[in-house]
Amino acid sequence: MRKTALSGMPKSPLNISGGSPHWRHFDGLQPYAPLVQSMQEHAAAIRAEGAAEAVWLLQHEAVYTGGTSARDADLLAPGDIPALRNGRGGQWTFHGPGQRIAYVMLDIAARGHDVRALVHGLESWVIASLADCGVAGHRRDGLPGIWVQTGNSPSGMDKIAAIGIRISRWVSWHGLAINLDPELAAFDAIVPCGVRDGGVTSLAALGVQISMPQLDQRLQARFHDFF
């Protein structure tokens, strides 16, 4: 797959500072509930105390999470993996080893109160970062996340990244998940994001050999193109 050139891409209207945010990398697999509690507390501190905007990069222990639109019927057979509802936007997804989570805590009030622009910026950030890995990512009208053309599902498109955010007092939290090399069979236990005509893929399944630190470098390098 050829790398897509993105030079000259216009800045997002959300871009307000070359120095923000603070980046934090978590080592090891993180339990879901305590990490989300810490994220919620930091998001609240951004609004109440002027804490720094932040992007947290991590991997979770295996867990299914359901957003505000998640239906019980789409949780098919979770087995021994915990299934938790979390209040973000979206439906069911899987988090686990081999998946890069980016939790994005930004002051949306300082960025025009534009939630739609935030989501578009997150999508564009993922697409640009994937392009730097030699993968062409796409949006699908009316459907969340970033998709790649594989021909392996009824739609011909498989999801490689999920996006789900929550806004509290005009501060974003939650964020996105990029499949580097997770256990893709884990997605068979749910209807991922409620979409039945698309599969799930990963960078590894597409033949891309890249480490998690190398993916992180691409994410950090592209962030200020859009925020």
State each model region's role.
Residues 1-155, 160, 189, 209:
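N-terminal lobe of the biotin/lipoate ligase/transferase fold
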Residues 2-3, 147, 166, 177-227:
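C-terminal accessory segment of soluble enzyme catalytic cores
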Residues 161, 174:
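A translation/RNA-centric and nucleic-acid-associated enzymatic feature enriched
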Residues 169-173:
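Glycine-rich phosphate/pyrophosphate-binding beta-alpha loops
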